[in-house]
UniProtKB/Swiss-Prot annotation:
It comes from Salmonella heidelberg (strain SL476). GO terms for molecular function: magnesium ion binding; manganese ion binding; NAD+ diphosphatase activity; NADH pyrophosphatase activity; RNA NAD-cap (NMN-forming) hydrolase activity; zinc ion binding. Divalent metal cations. Mg(2+) or Mn(2+). Binds 1 zinc ion per subunit. Its cofactor is Mg(2+); Mn(2+); Zn(2+). A divalent metal cation 3 binds at E174, E178, E219. SUPFAM superfamilies: Nudix. A divalent metal cation 1 binds at A158, E178, E219. The lineage of its organism: Bacteria, Pseudomonadati, Pseudomonadota, Gammaproteobacteria, Enterobacterales. The gene is nudC. This is NAD-capped RNA hydrolase NudC.
Length: 257
């Protein structure tokens, strides 16, 4: 699947190492390979954006290495491809040797996988399923400040799905563990690949059922009900959390305005 990049090769360039992304001038490189000193490098074609190829180059650059979060305000499709590149780069870096027999591995030529030529084991990129849920109580939405978000942003509740657990069970458990309340009338909304580091967010809306807010201090700094027209600082546009909040606000406006 990989190839040597030639002088006139063009497209979008995902240059990644250790979950970082090369962002000269704060943007994803776009254009001729020669303009970015990429001629002669090995590259994988990982997709297409606006009719042009998207290439992954496994390489560290001394300057301008940043987080994929810096391109979250790009078009959703391009952000997803950037996230794919960063996750694949980390997958290839962390799977150089077989976990069963210890022998060197090599990339598959037909799929995103690493193969062991000794014991024939096959490894795929790990994806961690997560739930994220907007909870409505009449004209209000439950928003919380997480311990890892010290910038004042309030968002909806989220968490990882545990082994042997359904998505619906994960929603009920995470909400109870983090806020102490029960929910009902769960409804699936959408999903979003989230490369921090390798999650797949499954988004839901739910209604408040019972209980008083009792936060888990290991997870949350605070949690409260906020009326739809009096909200605190929210996650940025482009995130599934922001979409859930905006969808909930739209439902409240339709009913209470």
């Amino acid at each position: 699947m990989d190839r040597i990049i030639e002088k006139l090769e063009s497209g979008w360039w995902i240059v990644s190492h250790e979950q970082k992304l090369w962002l000269p001038y704060g943007e994803l490189p776009h254009g001729l390979a020669a303009n970015f000193d990429l001629v002669g490098q090995r590259a994988l074609r990982i997709g297409e954006w606006q009719g042009e190829p998207v290439w992954l180059v496994l390489q560290h650059r001394r300057h301008d290495m940043g987080s994929v979060r810096q391109v979250i305000d790009q078009d959703a499709g391009l952000f997803q491809l950037a996230g794919r590149g960063v996750q694949l780069a980390e997958f290839y870096r962390s799977h150089k040797f077989c976990g069963y027999c210890g022998h060197p591995m090599h990339p598959s030529k037909t799929e995103w996988a690493m193969l062991c030529s000794h014991c024939r084991e096959r490894y795929y990129p790990q994806i961690a399923p997560c739930i994220i849920v907007a909870i409505r109580r009449e004209d209000s939405i439950l928003l919380a400040r997480h311990v890892r978000h010290r910038n004042g942003v309030h968002t909806v509740l989220a968490g990882f799905v545990e082994v042997g657990e359904t998505l619906e069970q994960a929603v009920a458990r995470e909400v109870m563990e983090e806020s102490g309340i029960k929910v009902k009338n769960l409804r699936y909304v959408t999903s979003q690949p989230w490369p921090f580091p390798q999650s797949l967010m499954t988004a839901f809306m739910a209604e408040y059922d019972s209980g008083e807010i009792v936060i888990d201090p290991k997870e949350l700094l605070e949690a409260n009900w906020y009326r739809y027209d009096d909200l605190p600082l929210l996650p940025p546009p482009g995130t599934v959390a922001r979409r859930l909040i905006e969808d909930t606000v739209a439902m409240c406006r339709a009913e209470y305005d």
